[in-house]
C-alpha cells in the first residue's frame, strides 16, 4: 500500500530536493487557531506536517514543546479533538502527509483498535510514538502497519550498528534521526556529524532519513537538507507561536502569520539546499 508519505518522497526525489517537515502541537494555543496554522503550513512550503498529541508527561520534549502541550490541554484539546482537527484539515488538503507524534499512554487509553480506525478515517498517514521501543511492536506498530499507517521510528546518536536493525525492522515511511542527545530545542544540530550519521543509517535501509532536533534557522535547515532526505523543525515554530501570544497566552491577530512566515523562511532554506548541491 502506497501512503501519502511514500508519494511525497517519490515526488521530492523527482524534484531532487529534501523534505521540509514541520511540527506543532495540536490545539496550541487553542483548537481554532491551531487548525488555521496547520492549514497555512502547506502554503508556506511544508511538505509533511507532524502534529503533536498533547500529553501530561512528555518526557522527550523541551520547555517550549511542553508549554505548547500545556496550552493545548488547558484549551480543552484531546486526542479525539486532534483527530477531528485533522479531519477538518483534510477537507481542504488531501495530499499533504500528516504524522501524529507523541506518547503511547493517550493511545492506550483511547483504545488501540479504535484509535487506528479513527486516525485512518481522519486522514492520518503515519505515527511516531517516542516511548514504544521495537520490543513492543505488537502493541501498536504491527497493528498500525496492518491498518495502512506508516510507523516511523527514531534513531539517535547512541543507536549503534548492532541496535539499528531492530529499530528499522518494522519502520516505514521514513526514519527520524534525532541529531542530538537530549530533549527537543536543547542544542543546535551539527550538519557535518549529521551527514555521517545519515550515511550510516542508509547502509541499513532504503527508507528516507529525515533529521530533527536543533534546527532553528533557514541556514541550519539548508545545511541539514543538503545531508539528509528531510529537515524537521518543531521548537523554533513553537517558539514563534508562543512569542506571538498576548500576556494571557491567547492567540493574537498575528499568531497564524508569525508561524507561517517562519515556516516559509525555513522552507526556502530547505529548497535552497538542492540549488547549492547542483
Swiss-Prot record:
CDD domains: Tryptophan_synthase_alpha (cd04724)
Alphabetical list of SUPFAM superfamilies matching this protein: Ribulose-phoshate binding barrel
Record-annotated active site: 50 (proton acceptor), 61 (proton acceptor)
Pathway(s) the chain acts in: Amino-acid biosynthesis; L-tryptophan biosynthesis; L-tryptophan from chorismate: step 5/5
Stretches that traverse the bilayer: none
Keyword rRNA-binding: no
Record InterPro entries: Aldolase_TIM (IPR013785), RibuloseP-bd_barrel (IPR011060), Trp_synthase_alpha_AS (IPR018204), Trp_synthase_suA (IPR002028)
Keywords: Amino-acid biosynthesis, Aromatic amino acid biosynthesis, Lyase, Tryptophan biosynthesis
Cellular component terms (Gene Ontology): cytosol
GO molecular function: tryptophan synthase activity
Catalytic activity, EC: 4.2.1.20
Reaction catalysed by this enzyme: (1S,2R)-1-C-(indol-3-yl)glycerol 3-phosphate + L-serine = D-glyceraldehyde 3-phosphate + L-tryptophan + H2O
Pfam families tied to this protein: Trp_syntA
Broad EC category: lyase
UniProt keyword Amino-acid biosynthesis present: yes
Cross-referenced NCBIfam families: trpA (TIGR00262)
HAMAP family: Trp_synth_alpha (MF_00131)
Quaternary state and interactors: Tetramer of two alpha and two beta chains.
Similarity annotation: Belongs to the TrpA family.
Biological role: The alpha subunit is responsible for the aldol cleavage of indoleglycerol phosphate to indole and glyceraldehyde 3-phosphate.
Record protein name field: Tryptophan synthase alpha chain
Organism: Nitrobacter winogradskyi (strain ATCC 25391 / DSM 10237 / CIP 104748 / NCIMB 11846 / Nb-255)
Amino acid at each position: 500500500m502506497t501512503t501519502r508519505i511514500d508519494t511525497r518522497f517519490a515526488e521530492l526525489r523527482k524534484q531532487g530536493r529534501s523534505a521540509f517537515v514541520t511540527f506543532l502541537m495540536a490545539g496550541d494555543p487553542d483548537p481554532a487557531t491551531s487548525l488555521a496554522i496547520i492549514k497555512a503550513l502547506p502554503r508556506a512550503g511544508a511538505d509533511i506536517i507532524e502534529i503533536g498529541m498533547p500529553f501530561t508527561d512528555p518526557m522527550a520534549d523541551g520547555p517550549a514543546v511542553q508549554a505548547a502541550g500545556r496550552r493545548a490541554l488547558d484549551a480543552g484539546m484531546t486526542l479525539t479533538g486532534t483527530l477531528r482537527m485533522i479531519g477538518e484539515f483534510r477537507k481542504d488538503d488531501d495530499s499533504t502527509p500528516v504524522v501524529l507524534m507523541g506518547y503511547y499512554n493517550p493511545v492506550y487509553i483511547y483504545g488501540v483498535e479504535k484509535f487506528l480506525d479513527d486516525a485512518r478515517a481522519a486522514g492520518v498517514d503515519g505515527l511516531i510514538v517516542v516511548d514504544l521501543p521495537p520490543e513492543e511492536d505488537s502493541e501498536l506498530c504491527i497493528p498500525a502497519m496492518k491498518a495502512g499507517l506508516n510507523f516511523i521510528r527514531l534513531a539517535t546518536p547512541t543507536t549503534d550498528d548492532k541496535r539499528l536493525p531492530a529499530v528499522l525492522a518494522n519502520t516505514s515511511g521514513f526514519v527520524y534521526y534525532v541529531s542530538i542527545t537530549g530533549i527537543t530545542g536543547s542544542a543546535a544540530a551539527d550538519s557535518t556529524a549529521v551527514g555521517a550519521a545519515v550515511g550510516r543509517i542508509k547502509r541499513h535501509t532504503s527508507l528516507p532519513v529525515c533529521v530533527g532536533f536543533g534546527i532553528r534557522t533557514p541556514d541550519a535547515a539548508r545545511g541539514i537538507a543538503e545531508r539528509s532526505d528531510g529537515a524537521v523543525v518543531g521548537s523554533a515554530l513553537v517558539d514563534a507561536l508562543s512569542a506571538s501570544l498576548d500576556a494571557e497566552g491567547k492567540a493574537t491577530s498575528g499568531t497564524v502569520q508569525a508561524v507561517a512566515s517562519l515556516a516559509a523562511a525555513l522552507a526556502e532554506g530547505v529548497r535552497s539546499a538542492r540549488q547549492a548541491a547542483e
